[in-house]
């Protein structure tokens, strides 16, 4: 395949805040994104551009009211309007040699509420609920013109989300700590699932479908400690069970053998930690030398439904624990910086969600200029 895909992206954001005294705040926000992809074949001396391009436009408008009667607590309610426009080619023959342009629009409404309460100084709790909509990504709708096959008819995910968080922060001289823990609940309809399909020539590609109902229950915990301006240590741990909540099989009245089982190809336990060292005014005032070590851990998971893979090691992606190191020198208070990074410096065997091995140890360099 010798082809070229040209993507055009643009987005616009507008936010208006209106304060009514010091207690009431009204916020109106609008986010508009537009994407267009033009494909061309380079197999001949003359570039042949597809007659039908692929296009999507997303518009999300939100209105929020926030009540802040004291410094101890606040309460917010909000509503959202989602609009999605998708257009692209659809084959009209089994040989897929003739296409017509098709398009459709979808509208959804969402709403929610959130509250924050400072129980004592430094101790804060947050509660939130949202009827949400997740619009599909570019890859889920159009693929990547290679090994990802999109579906322009895929529907957005719709879910009921609940979150409870508790956090604590404090400073003791040069020492500061931050702890946070939370519980997560989601009930998702039309869950967008990534599947692997077999292609000719022994090749495989990914496709996306809407799966009826998925339920997520989980928790997360994070901890961070800092000593002055020269040391920072932190870590996160998450367990997220994303389970099949369909009692019957899709498009059938037969019992679903995967009911209450974890969705395939999704890690459900993962963690990371990092250590950062800073040398301020290194060589010159305003310059900083920093050294960062970080790691990522993924617990083993199945790339078929868990009640199948749990008893067959061949269907399990093994535990993964990778280590990275980054050295950065920033100048003129961060205006210029040069970084050198070694990812997976212990050359661990790492895999994607379908047990395909990733590249090993890698080195990167980066120069950044902040205007």
Where are these regions (language model features)?
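Outer-membrane beta-barrel translocator domains and adjoining extracellular loop/strand segments
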Residues: 1-2, 38-46, 87-96, 137-145, ...
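Gram-negative outer-membrane beta-barrel transporters
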Residues: 179, 184-187, 209-304
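Conserved C-terminal beta-signal and adjacent last beta-strands/turns
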Residues: 61, 65-66, 113-116, 127, ...
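Short loop/turn motifs that connect adjacent beta-strands in outer-membrane beta-barrel proteins
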Residues: 19-25, 68-73, 120-122, 171-178, ...
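Transmembrane beta-strands of outer-membrane beta-barrel pores
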Residues: 32-36, 67, 81-87, 129-135, ...
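Membrane-embedded beta-barrel scaffold of Gram-negative outer-membrane proteins
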Residues: 118, 124-130, 156-217, 238
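Extracellular loop and loop/strand-boundary signature of outer-membrane beta-barrel proteins
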Residues: 1-3, 11, 44-52, 64, ...
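Surface-exposed extracellular loop regions of Gram-negative outer-membrane beta-barrel proteins
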Residues: 1, 25-42, 55-97, 106-112, ...
